[in-house]
Amino acid sequence: MVLLYQPKKQKKLRAAFTTIVQDLDYQGLGVAKIQGKTWFIENALPQEQVQVQVIEEKRQYGLGRVQKILQASPLRQTPRCAYYQICGGCQSQHIPIHLQRETKQKALFQRLTKLQKEAIEFMPMISGEAWHYRRRVRLSLYWDAKSKNLKIGFRQKNSQQIVNIRQCDVLDPLLNELLPKLHELLSTWSKPKTLGHIELVAADNGVAMLLRVTEKLAEHDRTLLLDFAFNHQVMLFVQDEKEICHLQGDLPYYQLDDGSILHFDIRDFIQVNRQLNQNMVNTALDWLDLKKKDNVLDLFCGMGNFTLPISRYVKSAVGIEGVLPMVEKARRNGERNHCHNVQFYQCDLSQSFTEQEWAKVPFDKILLDPPRSGAAFALNALCYLMAEKIVYVSCNPATLVRDVELLLKFGYQLKKVAMIDMFPHTSHLESISLFERNR
């Protein structure tokens, strides 16, 4: 018998409904309870009466967006950005910055309070400027052959469409100044279909720019690009299908307060917020309470953002990173900064590392700054190192909670926590935590 395929019927979404918003979650979504179901509503504030368009509905929760504001909150503010309604970037600009921060901090502290009986010292928030804080940006490029128009900007939320922008209020002023000039440059490009994207970084020694193209540069375009880089003092890199070429200027770098200078390649990860990166490093150094006799381990160390400053206060510092090119850069940064008591090793921290030679050293203190996926596997091995203090920098509250539970299980106590508002006007929540081994 032939079984005919019958497509599954799409569940029909309920019609728009009206509700009063009761709360705000840490991602900037309004929260309403309707007949036992929790609804998370985009662009809604507490105490507002809103008409809600349903985006998705599950058994226990639903997701919607404001279709119409029937009664606005006195807290609602006019978004500063001209592209706010269409850009997929900063989605919390209608919320006053103090409320954004208070809501994130409250959510973080409430989650962590439930994990241990002992009191946790909740430290003042680490925050900075709410605008012009981003020193790095990736711009999408799209050539519309029909209108003969090149779009430079960001993708719309939940869409592949590009929002054509001339400025962005969260970018470093040096990057903002270049945006209209990039429009002007690329409008005369001979092969606009070959344009991929642009990455810009406001380094401490100037602006670095990477242009991604799908084929080798035409001579006309290469000349335009080199003239642009020379006239605007831009460190220029071009990436085609085969390689990245450094065409003009020095390697970018940034400097920390202790004098450490970290050189990096244009595509390397660096913290986007210059000011808060420094504040975060200062906090880590303070909480670790470093001594001249200490041996310190820095996991997920990148190019040495924490390792090099740590090394200036201790007997030895060891940095571990999974990506070999980053390890090589960290070593070069250590040499340039005359940090002779620091060593860097490549190791996959999602695999067992207890048999590695570097792991056989008795470490007094440990710092880890893992990716969003957290550090669960690494923590299983860390328990054997018996360090007295661990500082954990997190960029994901969900994996932080999971990893805190592991550390508590392994005999550590959560002593201090501070929220880091690294990305104002977004849903991102970062934090730094101090753990001490139970005696």
UniProtKB/Swiss-Prot annotation:
Classification via Pfam families: TRAM, tRNA_U5-meth_tr
Catalysed reaction equations from the record: uridine(1939) in 23S rRNA + S-adenosyl-L-methionine = 5-methyluridine(1939) in 23S rRNA + S-adenosyl-L-homocysteine + H(+)
Transmembrane feature ranges: none
SUPFAM superfamilies listed in its UniProt record: Nucleic acid-binding proteins, S-adenosyl-L-methionine-dependent methyltransferases
Keywords: 4Fe-4S, Iron, Iron-sulfur, Metal-binding, Methyltransferase, rRNA processing, S-adenosyl-L-methionine, Transferase
EC number in record: 2.1.1.190
Signal sequence, renumbered to the chain: none
Function of the protein: Catalyzes the formation of 5-methyl-uridine at position 1939 (m5U1939) in 23S rRNA.
Protein name: 23S rRNA (uracil(1939)-C(5))-methyltransferase RlmD
Organism the protein comes from: Histophilus somni (strain 129Pt) (Haemophilus somnus)
